[in-house]
UniProtKB/Swiss-Prot annotation:
<dbReference type="GO" id="GO:0007155">
    <property type="term" value="P:cell adhesion"/>
</dbReference>
<keyword id="KW-0325">Glycoprotein</keyword>
<dbReference type="GO" id="GO:0005890">
    <property type="term" value="C:sodium:potassium-exchanging ATPase complex"/>
</dbReference>
<keyword id="KW-0406">Ion transport</keyword>
<feature type="transmembrane region" description="Helical; Signal-anchor for type II membrane protein">
    <location>
        <begin position="35"/>
        <end position="62"/>
    </location>
</feature>
<dbReference type="GO" id="GO:0016324">
    <property type="term" value="C:apical plasma membrane"/>
</dbReference>
<feature type="topological domain" description="Cytoplasmic">
    <location>
        <begin position="1"/>
        <end position="34"/>
    </location>
</feature>
<keyword id="KW-0472">Membrane</keyword>
<dbReference type="GO" id="GO:0030007">
    <property type="term" value="P:intracellular potassium ion homeostasis"/>
</dbReference>
<comment type="subunit">
    <text>The sodium/potassium-transporting ATPase is composed of a catalytic alpha subunit, an auxiliary non-catalytic beta subunit and an additional regulatory subunit. Interacts with catalytic subunit ATP12A. Interacts with regulatory subunit FXYD1. Interacts with regulatory subunit FXYD3. Interacts with NKAIN1, NKAIN2 and NKAIN4. Interacts with MLC1. Part of a complex containing MLC1, TRPV4, AQP4 and HEPACAM. Interacts with KIRREL3. Interacts with OBSCN (via protein kinase domain 1).</text>
</comment>
<dbReference type="GO" id="GO:1990573">
    <property type="term" value="P:potassium ion import across plasma membrane"/>
</dbReference>
<dbReference type="InterPro" id="IPR038702">
    <property type="entry name" value="Na/K_ATPase_sub_beta_sf"/>
</dbReference>
<dbReference type="GO" id="GO:0051117">
    <property type="term" value="F:ATPase binding"/>
</dbReference>
<feature type="disulfide bond">
    <location>
        <begin position="159"/>
        <end position="175"/>
    </location>
</feature>
<dbReference type="GO" id="GO:0050998">
    <property type="term" value="F:nitric-oxide synthase binding"/>
</dbReference>
<keyword id="KW-0812">Transmembrane</keyword>
<keyword id="KW-0740">Sodium/potassium transport</keyword>
């Protein structure tokens, strides 16, 4: 037994290092050098092929514009305040109940203040009335960064925060700010005048992408009451001169146009579902994405 164990232990040690043949784990130094050299060259070639493929692919991709722009989905429509579950519930007599919503709006509108748009090297005036899309050249760096249209906060009227720092919440007349999400190169195509029935008090302009808010269900439509829209030129929509968007590299300070809606006569103590939709020839809607071209929000004003 002892001899067998000694012999077995000796063969195991001999496999690790054979002093007679100068072998380590069954290979000589020259053999180990050759096999290591082979794998270094083999994996080096694989890495070279991989890096070369990536470099060729990067040559076909522009950092300023997506290659497959036609496959990008239409932009989403979202609201501020941005809250979880898109539910707004508050009591006008209790400032704490709507503080979160007001702070959310204040923070969002910070970059729309006049003091944040003073740099004439970055911002430019694009008029006070809606006009056609403003082309700023090709999507490349030949002309450097492109200027951005200013957006005046006072266009948002009662929802600007200039005269009412609570944006109507203390009076039970809440405001929401609506924006169209940024899609690089997207140019909205408004619908024809006769293809859309406009709400009372709203008007058509071929250079405005219209937005309308209504009750989501039949019972909601009766409880929404009246509402007011505030935007450039008092149009309920987004003026086209703010498009197309050239991306963060070419327009890092871009300000998307805004539309404010104030609900002035909501039925109290009732949860009301409100749907807002943008209308356009290239605006789409999806059952899988409830923010594509539209959104709905629940609002409850408590007594």
């Amino acid at each position: 037994m002892a001899r067998g164990k000694a012999k077995e232990e000796g063969s195991w040690k001999k496999f690790i290092w054979n002093s007679e043949k100068k072998e380590f784990l069954g290979r000589t130094g020259g053999s180990w050098f050759k096999i290591l050299l082979f794998y270094v060259i083999f994996y080096g070639c694989l890495a070279g092929i991989f890096i070369g493929t990536i470099q060729v692919m990067l040559l076909t991709i522009s950092e300023f514009k997506p290659t497959y722009q036609d496959r990008v989905a239409p932009p989403g429509l979202t609201q501020v305040p941005q809250i979880q579950k898109t539910e707004i519930a508050f009591r006008p007599s209790d400032p704490k109940s709507y503080e979160e919503y007001v702070v959310n709006i204040v923070r969002f509108l910070e970059k729309y203040k006049d003091s944040a748009q003073k740099d004439d090297m970055v911002f430019e005036d694009c008029g006070d009335v809606p006009s056609e899309p403003k082309e700023r050249g090709e999507f490349n760096n030949e002309r450097g960064q492109r200027k951005v249209c200013r957006f005046k906060l006072n266009w948002l009227g009662n929802c600007s925060g200039i005269d009412d720092e609570t944006y109507g919440y203390k009076d039970g007349k809440p405001c929401i700010i609506i924006k169209l999400n940024r899609v690089l190169g997207f140019k909205p195509k408004p619908p024809k005048n006769d293809s859309l029935e406009f709400s009372p008090g709203t008007k058509y302009n071929p250079n405005v992408l219209p937005v309308q808010c209504t009750g989501k269900r039949d019972e909601d439509k009766e409880k929404v009451g009246s509402m007011e829209y505030f935007g450039m030129g008092d149009y309920a929509g987004f003026p086209l001169q703010y498009y197309p968007y050239y991306g963060k590299l070419l327009q890092p300070k871009y300000l998307q146009p805004l539309l404010a809606v104030q609900f002035t006569n909501l039925t109290m103590d009732t949860e009301i579902r409100i749907e807002c939709k943008a209308y356009g020839e290239n605006i789409g809607y999806s059952e899988k994405d409830r923010f594509q071209g539209r959104f709905d929000v629940k609002i409850e004003v408590k007594s």
